[in-house]
Amino acid sequence: MAKTKRQIAEDLRLIDVVIEIRDARIPVSSQNPDMKELIKNKKQIIVLNKSDLADEKETLKWIKHFKDNGLSAISASSNSGKGINNVIKEIDKLMEEERKVSEQKGRVGKATRVLVIGIPNVGKSSFINRISKKTTMAVGNKPGVTKQKQWIRLSNNIELLDTPGVLWPKFESEEVALNLAFTGTIKDDILPKVEVAYRLLKFLLENYKNNVIERYKINKE
């Protein structure tokens, strides 16, 4: 992890905008706290990915929360493509003034360089495949599929730099660890499987009981 952090810190010197991919189901738990300090001086966009798997009402609340705190935030689904074009628009919006200054100085057509970060299994590679309209990157429901740094050029003068997903060495709370386990972000053998299953079912029954009953055709009687 230390090596990857050093590489990201070095790459940030070349970057205009940072896109942080988070899981819309766990928007706080899916942020690497070590990255927060690294990117604090850069323009940022939080993309709540996998929105098709999340509670839409809760996602909208989180989007409002981030915006109320001065952060750009967008709900998206790399699976369906919903919200992806809004990310491009937000990049253009954030870079509007800088582009005007560059044009005044004669640097017309200067590419906007964007760093895409995120912990494993939040859909980073799927997001880049969708936004670049390609399927050349390794994608899978397995933490840590992306291993090497990759530059991807988009048609609208934006260059994306992808980096491997990085988890932090110690989770600050049991809730964070459980949330990561619920969504398959950490390996199955890190936490006791029975405990994870019990806690997830308990959460679902307390918050989405009718959904569970409908999904598994449970007889209410």
Describe the function of each predicted region.
Residues 1-17, 25-26, 31-34, 38-44, ...:
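Helix-rich effector regions associated with P-loop NTPase G domains
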Residues 42-52:
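Active-site cofactor/substrate anionic-group-binding motifs, chiefly glycine-
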Residues 22-25, 51, 131, 164:
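Anionic group-transfer/hydrolysis microenvironments
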